Amino acid sequence: ARPRPASPPVGRSKVVAWALWDCGSTGLNAIVVTFVFSVYLTGTVGQGLTGGASPASLLGRALAIAGLTVAVLAPLTGVLVQAPHRRRVALAVLTGLAVLSTSATSLIRVDPEYLVAGLALLALTAACSDLASVPYNAMLRQLSTPETSGRISGLGWAAGYVGSVALLLLVYVGFIGGSGPTRGLFGVAVQDGHNVRAAMLVTAAWFALFALPLLLTAHTFAPAAEPGDRRVSLLGGYSQLWSDLRAEWQRDRNLVYFLLVSA
């Protein structure tokens, strides 16, 4: 079989659009999964929960379900999105689901009856965001050559780091910091979790804003010489993934390193 030709170099604007998606996605995960919404669920919404399981243990189960879902579906997703148009559609759908589920977390009130719904939305957001990274990472092959993949992937990683720090600062300063009945520079009421719920809307808007440039320009990326549409079984997806990783290791090890770090 012929080796796949390297993708031609692309303009800076397309690389920036690609990196901005990571800026939005990593920020969303930091707020929803790690630092703000998860703490709101276990420390506020779940207080007074009756029954044997604690809010923290229920959170662990929700994250385990999300992680298992990603572990099962990510390899198959990676094979199914090898065709560039499928890649774009999958990225748009999964990004949209992550934005919508994050927006819906603003409906979770300070009441133990809302805990299960909140955990379900958190798990859905985490799973969709992680699965969206599969077509996102695959787009790197359309943007880079073996010589530039390390630099471009590093830019994406840096954008994600900066995005998470910037959004954390925005949410803390604007909605969380301080004491009393209102919090943050915007003075949002703490009662019924309004300050955290407002921060979730800002987080959803953040991801949507930074994802938009990539979603609008992905169709202009140079199509790499990759397999077209085909039906693949779950086991076939894992087999194809292993074959692709071995082939990519021979072609461009920097890209494989980036995919492993992003996993």
Regions found by a protein language model. Give the residues of each.
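Helix-loop junctions on the cytosolic side of multi-pass membrane transporters
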Residues: Q142, G178, A211-D229
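Glycine-rich segments within core transmembrane alpha-helices of 12-TM secondary carriers
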Residues: S153-S179
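Helix-loop boundary and gating motifs at the non-cytosolic
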Residues: P5-G67, N254-S262
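Central cavity-lining transmembrane alpha-helices of secondary-active solute carriers
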Residues: A56-V81, L100-S101, L168
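Intracellular juxtamembrane helix-capping segments at the cytosolic ends
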Residues: D130-T145
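Cytoplasmic membrane-interface "Motif A"-like loop-to-helix N-cap segments
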Residues: V81-L97
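C-terminal ends and interior cores of transmembrane alpha-helices
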Residues: A92-E113
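Juxtamembrane intracellular "pre-TM" segments in multi-pass secondary transporters
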Residues: R2-V16, H219-L260
